[in-house]
Amino acid sequence: MRKYVFDAKKTKDEIVEWIRNYFRVNGPGCNAIIGISGGKDSTVVAALCCEALGKDRVIGVLMPQGVQDDIDVAREVVKYLDIQSFEINIGETVNKLLQAGRTGGIVDSHQARVNLPARIRMATLFMVSQSMNGRVSNNCNASESYIGWATIGGDAFGQFSPLGKLTVTEVKKIGFELGLPEKFIKKAPSDGLTGKTDEDNFGFTYEFLDHYIRTGDFDNDVETAAKIDKMHDANTFKEMPMPTFNPNCCEWGW
């Protein structure tokens, strides 16, 4: 079993400085554009950006799909953080794009329907970003990424990723270190697409997954460890940079 120690305060301070450095180099004076779902990841990212940049440079974007019961939590988050926010309902856009595809002869798959809202949300974030002098955050965590629980072109995208190398367990600890209310940190993670919690979809808990990722220990639960390994192996392509052909005729300086 691998040795594992996590210092939440030290890590929080390092992320704050990392965000400052990112904007210093890649967007002096730019705003952080954050899709706010009401879950712990987007809430923690927003709070970190507030500490790093000041709340006046943090903009939350709420993107419910039609009537969405938990959107009130996202509204509470932006009110608690006292940040500027916009609410843009993507329901009509999703439906119209699906209908346009069907009119054009596309028989849309279940996976296409499930992942389309995430992709529309990311397009929406970049629309807001280019209108508000921003840089779009990626709110994924290491637990999700390890098993491919993210949508290419959707929540897996963005321009800077404060939590991408932190597990769900670690993100929660960062949230408490930031002094965020427990209701924001302990809200059951869901995919935001099917109405199920992440753990319902997985068939195992984040606690088990995070412990396995960090230590390699699976407490003799061979079946669950094998399931995690299979999900990881099947989704590593999501973490790879886009393969690009490089011609031999010339040397590129970048």
Q: Which residues fall in each region the model found?
A:
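Extended, folded domain segments that form the structural surfaces/walls around functional sites
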Residues: S42, M63-Q65
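ATP/NTP-dependent adenylation/nucleotidyl-transfer catalytic domains that generate, transfer
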Residues: M1-I34, L48, D56-I59, G66, ...
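Conserved G/P- and acidic residue-centered "switch" motifs that form tight phosphate/ATP-binding loops
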Residues: G39
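Primarily recognizes the serine-hydrolase "nucleophile elbow" in alpha/beta-hydrolase
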Residues: E51
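Short, surface-exposed alpha-helical segments at coil->helix boundaries
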Residues: S42-A46, I71-R75
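Catalytic-core regions of hydrolytic enzymes
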Residues: R119-A123
